[in-house]
From Swiss-Prot:
UniProt GO BP: 'de novo' IMP biosynthetic process
Binding site for Mg(2+) 2: D114, D265
Highest taxon in the source lineage: Bacteria
Sorted UniProt keywords: ATP-binding, Cytoplasm, Ligase, Magnesium, Metal-binding, Nucleotide-binding, Purine biosynthesis
Location in or out of the cell: Cytoplasm
Keyword Nucleotidyltransferase part of the UniProt annotation: no
Name this polypeptide is given: Phosphoribosylformylglycinamidine synthase subunit PurL
GO annotations of cellular component type: cytoplasm
Residues annotated as binding ATP: Y49, K88, D498, G535
Documented EC number(s): 6.3.5.3
Active site per database record: H46, H92
């Protein structure tokens, strides 16, 4: 290509003039347009982590179970007895806002490829979703499209979606978040890496043909939205889950041979990123022959081929002499396969087109030599006033029962049954518990007796409001809550992946939020013994200058030695004792209650003592494994009253049944502060449990042994939730409000939403 490189062309490629000057310095000349395109995607935030890398290096990334940490397609941890788990979480936010079905679907496809590229068979997926105000005209459209895309792709792949969370807030009106998680299992001694090792080895393309979809998707994901957002639809990839299924099976068959030296998913920045990253990890060069790439569209240029983000494609470095073996297996699975390059020892990345070199670049500046910024940081200027807000000025509600009903109808708190009904969570029968609880529990079924009975727990979560008010503390809460959820099912947390969603890093207050959240995640992971083994950063989540809440999503994995010794959230037996592991402080700063009922998003998030957190988790984990408990449920959004209601309602059968066997509870809560604050405050490190009377003494002794406080509250029974001196509401009424929250959004039932409180936008939302 001979197009002149003007400042306008440089800007269109997402590079600053200073960065372009650095490109010229590395090359000692002007780049051509194809080379500029390569630098554009490799130096994008999405690929280079240029604003975040200096902070990410502070994460704890090693531990006794870590087999592969950050830097590869997915992290890998040791499950024992020769088995390992590969897992990762990744964002597809920008594409999902532009085209929700395909954006979400290809997000699932991409994270599945990241996992099976490591040599693992995916066995479970999860997701964390954020949408705007429930009454916003685009919220229902995005919710329906994203959920359909996730379900459509995952269901076709035969990988169950077993866990997730969905939250709503006005800050996501112009920028939804779609964070996808996948976990797979593999032999601990057969991990495949994305490396272009072995000079002379062939580089092979396998999978679907290359088209023009997704060109500059990585660059688009590294810029904020504006009024022209709808024009960016061509940068959204189009997925084919049936092709991905063939690619998965072909790769797993290839991994059983000695043909694979290295393998890399063609994800963001497509052929360019996969080939450059493989060369960079090996310290080698590559010669690529673009005229050999299988194409599905005529007239594609080298620029388009290199930057296409067509889905369901892999780049494989084969052992020399094993090309026919690779061809045979790929042909068997009806995949395109071609030799498209060779590994060289030159340290240069060269692209050829019909005998002519169209790009000749050094590898290092594209990888480790990419720009790294220590951007200016300053606390958000709104925080002093928000922290100074006098919570005692909040009026007390006239009827705590009505308040609870309104909170349960809030889409963030309401049942997500409509969502997980769109997902095939029972495929392969790996799920040991139904979705909707604290953490998913997945059976490990390998056919090997050594693995029989083992299970994996999965939890995902974040709290953007906490992270705005105190990024360091809010991020710690995200880690602690995921670990607490895993403890509720009897699991031991072992490792973390993350998806760090933030606004424009060029704004000092956003960069400060990012750095503080990273510091908080690191501190909590060190305290809880959960190293970070993989992750993703998504910046520029802004529309016309309005950024999202800082949302560092955590995906945590835990191990269960005996999957039959787990626990669910629901109260089960009349007469069971109800107790709270933890304390009652009535901390409402940053709470759903304060936002929903009083239009305020202010104060400080609840205090968090990580030593106390560990004691609470250890108490419940050991109690579950000893078989002492009938139920265990994390106390978080909406506080104690919401947790009690959920435990009563989760006893029921799915919506639509003629009779729902709800079960009630009668409790007496000590009130060290205002009743509404104690009932709806979101104090940290609390788990609500129930148990047979005969287990109570042993449970109290266990809690004392672990150093965790326990408060006996009451008993399970009846058909009403009664909190003595505060509220008494039939469980059927609670369940009706709880189950209608999300369907009301989909009906665009603004009148109902306003009446129930679910669409009440805060009068003073966070800046």
């Amino acid at each position: 290509m001979t197009e002149k490189i003007t400042p306008e062309v440089v800007a269109q490629h997402g590079l600053t003039q200073a960065e372009y000057d650095e490109v010229k310095r590395h090359l000692g000349r002007e780049p051509n347009l194809t080379e500029l395109g390569v630098f554009s995607v490799m130096w994008s935030e999405h690929c280079s982590y240029k604003s975040s890398r200096v902070h990410l290096k502070t994460f704890p990334t090693s531990g006794p179970r870590v087999l592969q940490g950050p830097g590869e397609n997915a992290g890998v941890v040791d499950l024992g007895d020769g088995l390992a788990a590969a897992f990762k979480m990744e964002s597809h936010n920008h594409p999902s806002y532009i085209e929700p079905y395909q954006g979400a679907a290809t997000g699932v496809g991409g994270i599945l490829r990241d996992v099976f590229t490591m040599g693992a068979r995916p066995i479970a997926s999860a997701n964390s979703l954020r949408f705007g105000d429930p009454s916003h005209p685009k919220t229902a459209y995005l919710l329906e499209g994203v959920v359909a895309g996730i379900g459509g792709y995952g269901n076709c792949m035969g990988v169950p979606t077993v866990a997730g969370e969905v939250m709503f807030h006005p800050s996501y009106n112009g920028n939804c978040l779609v964070n996808a998680f996948t976990l797979g299992i593999l032999p601990a001694d057969k991990i495949f890496l994305g490396t272009a090792a072995g000079v002379g080895n062939p580089v092979m393309y396998i999978g679907a043909k290359t088209g023009r979809d997704g060109i500059h998707g990585a660059t688009m994901a590294s810029a904020e939205f504006d009024a022209s957002t709808e024009e960016k639809r061509p940068t959204v990839q189009v997925g084919d889950p049936f092709m991905e299924k063939l690619l998965l099976e072909a790769c797993l068959e290839l991994f059983k041979t000695d043909a694979v030296v290295g393998i890399q998913d063609m994800g963001a920045a497509g052929f360019t990123s996969s080939s450059v990253e493989m060369a960079g990890r090996a310290g080698n060069g590559l010669d690529l022959f673009l005229d050999q790439v299988p194409l599905r569209e005529e007239g594609m240029t080298p620029y388009e081929i290199l930057l296409s983000e067509s889905q369901e494609r892999m780049l494989l470095v084969a052992a020399e002499g094993k090309e026919d073996m690779v061809r045979k297996i790929c042909t068997k699975w009806d995949l395109d396969v071609a030799i498209v390059g060779r590994v060289t020892g030159t340290g240069r990345w060269r692209a050829h087109w019909h005998g002519k070199v169209v790009a000749d670049l050094p590898v290092d500046p594209l990888t480790e030599g990419a720009p790294k910024y220590q951007r200016p940081m300053t606390p958000h200027p709104a925080l002093p006033a928000l922290h100074a807000f006098d919570l005692s000025t909040v009026p007390e509600p006239a009827d705590l029962g009505d308040t609870l009903l309104r909170l349960l109808a809030r889409p963030t708190i309401a049942s997500k049954e409509w969502v997980y009904q769109q997902y095939d969570h029972m495929v392969r029968l790996v799920g040991a518990v139904r979705p909707g609880g604290d953490a998913a529990v997945v059976r490990i079924a390998t056919g090997d007796e050594r693995h029989a009975g083992k299970g994996i727990a999965i939890s995902v979560g974040a709290n953007g409001r906490y992270c705005f008010l105190d990024p360091h503390l809010g991020a710690q809460h995200a880690v602690a809550e995921c670990a607490r959820n895993i403890a509720c099912v009897g699991g031991e947390p072992i490792a973390v992946t993350d998806c760090l969603n933030f606004g424009n890093p060029e704004k000092p207050e956003i960069m400060w939020q990012f750095a503080e959240c990273v510091r908080g995640i690191g501190d909590a992971c060190r305290a809880l013994g959960t190293p970070v083994v993989s992750g993703n950063v998504s910046l520029y989540n802004e529309t016309e200058g309005q950024g999202i809440l800082p949302t560092p999503t955590i995906g945590m994995v835990g191990l269960l030695p005996d999957v039959e010794k787990t626990c669910t959230s629901a109260f089960k037996n009349a007469g069971d004792v109800i107790a709270l592991v933890g304390t009652l402080q009535g901390e409402v700063g940053g709470s759903e209650y304060l936002s929903a009922e009083h239009g305020r998003e202010a104060g400080h998030p609840p205090a968090l003592d990580l030593a106390k957190e560990k004691a609470v988790q250890e108490t419940v984990r050991r109690a579950v494994r000893e078989g002492l408990l009938s139920s265990a449920h994390d106390c978080s959004d909406g506080g104690l009253a919401v947790a009690l209601a959920e435990c009563c309602m989760m006893h029921g059968v799915p919506a639509g049944a003629e009779k729902a066997p709800w079960i009630g509870a009668a409790v007496r809560v000590p009130f060290p502060a205002r009743k509404d604050f104690v009932l709806f405050g979101e104090d940290a490190s609390r788990i609500l449990v129930s148990m047979p009377k005969e287990s109570a003494a042993r449970f109290v002794a266990l809690a004392q042994e672990c150093g965790a406080p326990v408060i006996r509250l009451g008993a399970v029974g009846g058909d009403t939730l009664e909190i003595q001196g505060a509220l008494s509401v039939p469980v059927a009424e609670l369940a009706k409000a709880w189950r209608d929250g999300v369907p009301a959004v989909l009906r665009r039932d603004v009148g109902h939403a306003a009446a129930s409180g679910i669409a009440r936008e805060p009068q003073e939302p966070l800046p």
